[in-house]
Amino acid sequence: NSWEEIQRMQRDYPDVDIAVLKQPGKGKGDAVHHAFQQAKGDILMILDGDLTVPPEDMIKFYNVLASGVGEFVNGTRLVYGMEKNAMRFLNYHANRTFALIFSYLLNQQFTDTLCGTKVMFRSDYEKILANKSFFGDFDPFGDFDFIFGAVKLHLKVVEVPVRYRARTYGSTQISRFRHGFMLLKMVIFAFKKLKAI
């Protein structure tokens, strides 16, 4: 029902410049890449539509980029406390574990590699896209496309803590075990690319 809801929002707010796009493929990663290629600004932002991260937090991400403190800004949900039921117990510990693993593999500190909230310059996004083939094309969410790409380009990576809330809209499309297995495959692939002799 998301498509109808988005169209309704566009009709209800005619004074706001809302672009409505339909992705050609499937998955969040495909949707983000499609939207970024249509976007007009010099700064590109990802904010998940389930409102687990307040839209008001995006100003903090913008300020990090605009001030030159960082060139790739990644959200982290695991610094502040979070609302009850915002993240399942198993997901919480899996997120922490994957953050430690990818921090080691990438030689870059991450506390939350799977937070959907990310901000970057368009020019850096275009470079990340051009280098995407180095790490393959099997990330359905796009998080690792951006993280791997940013680290490979030696961008200044900064994490911004967000207050993670229980979702107020929609239902999760993430399968813990199927997508968890996919993440394990990414770990092995990244190890071979980055650490194996």
Segment roles from a protein language model:
Residues 1-21:
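Acidic donor-binding segment of Leloir-type glycosyltransferases
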Residues 35, 50, 121, 150, ...:
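Residue-level signature of catalytic and energy-coupling elements of molecular machines
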Residues 4-7, 33, 59, 148:
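Active-site phosphate/pyrophosphate- and oxyanion-stabilizing loops and adjacent acidic/basic residues
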